Swiss-Prot record:
Record CDD domains: EFh (cd00051)
Compartments it resides in: Cytoplasm, Cytoskeleton, Microtubule organizing center, Spindle pole body
Positions of modified residues (Phosphoserine): S82, S102
Keyword Chaperone among record annotations: no
Name of this protein: Calmodulin
Biological process terms in GO annotation: cell budding; cellular hyperosmotic response; cytoskeleton organization; endocytosis; karyogamy involved in conjugation with cellular fusion; microautophagy; microtubule cytoskeleton organization; phosphatidylinositol biosynthetic process
Effect of E68V: Highly reduced affinity for Ca(2+)
Alphabetical UniProt keywords: Calcium, Cytoplasm, Cytoskeleton, Metal-binding, Phosphoprotein, Repeat
Amino acid sequence: MSSNLTEEQIAEFKEAFALFDKDNNGSISSSELATVMRSLGLSPSEAEVNDLMNEIDVDGNHQIEFSEFLALMSRQLKSNDSEQELLEAFKVFDKNGDGLISAAELKHVLTSIGEKLTDAEVDDMLREVSDGSGEINIQQFAALLSK
């Protein structure tokens, strides 16, 4: 699972992990997960940490082994890369370069990335994130798709 990580990244993660592995038993408590992630530049919410914990604590011991942590970080970095790719795609479809996508542009973007959404679904998405202008900015779009 961690095959997309460089040796440098693995070493950085191991160092951060070791700082919180106080008794050197190869694991950290679930309550320390958020602190470790923040030390690596991520900013997970409490709910996200709980969700992640439920997913990665595969043996259910409320401890996170380094292998579980590496799998998590690999996935988190991949997610961040996907968000960056999404932002780049957004910019491509922002025809006039004003940082906004209209409903028509959004429909085109969603069709281009393989989504098969109806007009009503796109309208619902716009209503959820728009300030009422019928357009959304890059940050609103990324936030919408990361929910």
